[in-house]
From Swiss-Prot:
Assembly mode: Heterodimer of an alpha (LcdA) and a beta (LcdB) subunit.
Matches recorded under PANTHER family: 2-HYDROXYGLUTARYL-COA DEHYDRATASE, D-COMPONENT-RELATED, SUBUNIT OF OXYGEN-SENSITIVE 2-HYDROXYISOCAPROYL-COA DEHYDRATASE
Function: Involved in the acrylate pathway for the conversion of D-lactic acid to propionic acid. Catalyzes the reversible dehydration of Lactoyl-CoA and 2-hydroxybutyroyl-CoA to acryloyl-CoA and crotonyl-CoA, respectively.
UniProt entry keywords in alphabetical sequence: 4Fe-4S, Flavoprotein, FMN, Iron, Iron-sulfur, Lyase, Metal-binding
Record EC number: 4.2.1.54
Mechanisms controlling activity: Activated by the LcdC protein.
GO MF, any single term: lactoyl-CoA dehydratase activity
EC category: lyase
UniProt cross-references to InterPro entries, sorted A to Z: FldB/FldC_alpha/beta
Cofactor note: Binds 1 [4Fe-4S] cluster.
Full protein name: Lactoyl-CoA dehydratase subunit beta
Family: Belongs to the FldB/FldC dehydratase alpha/beta subunit family.
Amino acid sequence: MSRVEAILSQLKDVAANPKKAMDDYKAETGKGAVGIMPIYSPEEMVHAAGYLPMGIWGAQGKTISKARTYLPAFACSVMQQVMELQCEGAYDDLSAVIFSVPCDTLKCLSQKWKGTSPVIVFTHPQNRGLEAANQFLVTEYELVKAQLESVLGVKISNAALENSIAIYNENRAVMREFVKVAADYPQVIDAVSRHAVFKARQFMLKEKHTALVKELIAEIKATPVQPWDGKKVVVTGILLEPNELLDIFNEFKIAIVDDDLAQESRQIRVDVLDGEGGPLYRMAKAWQQMYGCSLATDTKKGRGRMLINKTIQTGADAIVVAMMKFCDPEEWDYPVMYREFEEKGVKSLMIEVDQEVSSFEQIKTRLQSFVEML
């Protein structure tokens, strides 16, 4: 096994076994983990407290039963899966769970949490251009920090926060480099492997993830770039799961050369910048800089233009919209984006994503037909 294969295998194992990753961290440090609900949270606070931030993004292919009691049928599958798992006690080992509430279903779920872990809820301001929005979010972060300190029994110092911010900024920068390398080496980093590298960072200390990805990049770049005889796409949406869906991309030689997925590249899009103000203020300012996301209000609707630019920069053949079933914010963005794609002559395909689905024949047929048309 080559070193590239070994690193990818390690990251895939972490991505597929989050509970083991959490248990290993507990055994190593004596501290626990804090759940991080979609989409954005001040993970740096959890890291600064010495606890492991654990992403909570549902499950793949799990049958929903108990969750139907608490959520309507038109709640997205990520929230349905999370509700199902927490009804089964899957998250009870977490020391706390942090909720941001940018959509109606997240608001609902934060109030219906059935697990034993304490829930910490905060709100991102949506009128993001105002300085008042920054001050509001600082106040929200101060409340999150105070609740974390109370629940975890620790003190989160500014020095610890600054250190965590630097670690997270480095991880985001390394992952942005990984995106470019993966685009150049689709024979090495296929759709499944690319997703695993992103997903593993949800269940690892960022400094350890950074070290592995740095080594992975160096090993890959030591080999020559080979011509790609398949198609290249940019993917946008909340997430691209289950893995059976990614297998279809591999089957038809569809390389993901860039993405705008909430679970993946949106997490690394914006750094916490240096400057005046304390760490909480600068973390709040990062939200003001966020762009191209359906959960971050943008009256100018720049997401479509951003995606078109990505296709130009990467030489992609098309855009694939991975539409999360019953996700209102994503559905509201799609008509605007689609019109812009058509006006610019950019080919696109919309596929419906549902974590509960077990049959992929329809998506397989649509992707096959789309590839043949490109």
